[in-house]
Amino acid sequence: GQAVAAAETYIRDSEIEADIRTMVTPIWKAAGLEPNALHVYLVEDNQINSFVAGGQNEFINTGLVMRAKTPNQLIGVLAHETGHIAGGHLTRFQDAVRNASIEGIIAMVLGAAATVAGKGSGGGAAMLPAEGVAQRAFLQYSVTQEASADHAAMTFLDAAGQSARGLLEFFQVLQGEELLSGTREDPYLRSHPLTSQRIEYVRNHVEHSRFSDVPDTPANIELLKRIKVKLGAFTSPPSTTLAAYPEKDQSVLARYARAIAYYRIPNLNKALPTIDGLIREYPNDPYFRELKGQMLFENGRVADAIQPYEEAVRLAPGAPLLRISLAQTYIESNDPKMNKRAIAFLNDAVRTEYKETQGWHLLATAYGRDNQIGMAALALAEEGLTAGKKKDAQQQALRAKGLLPKNSAGYNRAENIHREAEQIEDASNSTNYR
């Protein structure tokens, strides 16, 4: 669960999520949404796709990020997804994943996409409601909703003083792919029907908006470059990365890419000096320190990993994923004092990352080691609820109630979890998202 890691299908990375948030926050504000209430998640999939699910969560495929030529293209796509959120557009899919964990949502989307494309009904398809499997409409917005989200996106981009040209370029790329293949194989096109009227509408807006020639900011251009370099280094074979960024390239991004590639081999004799050089030059960058902590932790050097992780958290105090990584390091150090610190950091992190099962799992471990068995059971109940496992959630909630003082905050939360878990479909008991 460190840095760029998670289930096979999705990537959690503090830096990339923060950078995308930086780019899209002006759009969220223009839409009248509270930025802290929104999440952006990366799906590890080379196909072009993005979608909204489970409330105010915007999902974006790594394939779309890597294909974006400009920040404006990425912002345009996310402005469109924000249009769906602001418009309260619900597909039947939205209803099905209302309370699902991030893994659960992605498993359903991939299952639905495979079924819609006729790629067998194995795996994820079993998680869909019966009529959803049969009907493509499960994931699909209506043409009216699509037009409405486009209209909203134009409004938000104008209000933020940004160009809609990126969205038009993105539509043109998709249209080209559709014409080439002659089918609707692209998952984005299946869930977001693209009509010539939609393209015309955006083109017309670009012709008339006074913001159409507003260039991308140098800061955003730099952010997208760094996102793509980091994503590429984490998802391509290390040999590919090292060939793309030979030692003679001493730019910051090339060294960052090489540090990641060496760590993934794993060759710490080369990875550590490379990342140490970047830390020396950029002492206030939390993510270089995070990578160093990750390298050390994953190679069994737990005690050495604590300091870089602590420094990363000090430099990015608002990043819950960094707190979860640091807490994991504290727990693995097998020091009771550190374990107490882990409990404090995790309680802080799960307030915003309540859909991230790993935080709850680590919290249960830390409470267990601290002999707070009632609180450990409560954390396991939260994990069960988040993962959509009705039986686990209810069993652990009852266990917590038996161990915690009656009417304490924990006792009352256990009661609520037991009640909330009733809403989970029984079918999902057999679904293991991890």
Feature annotation, model-predicted:
Residues 7, 12-14, 18, 40, ...:
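Extracytoplasmic and endomembrane cell-envelope/extracellular-matrix remodeling and assembly machinery
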Residues 82-99, 117:
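Catalytic Zn2+-binding segment of zinc metalloproteases
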Residues 252, 286-287, 303, 320-321, ...:
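Helix-start (N-cap) detector for alpha-helical repeat units in TPR-like alpha-solenoids
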Residues 260, 294, 328-331, 365, ...:
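Residue-level recognition of tetratricopeptide repeat
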Residues 266, 300, 334-337, 371, ...:
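Residue-level detector of the short coil/turn that links helix A to helix B
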Residues 369, 378-380, 386-434:
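Terminal, low-structured helical/coil segments at or just beyond the last alpha-helical repeat
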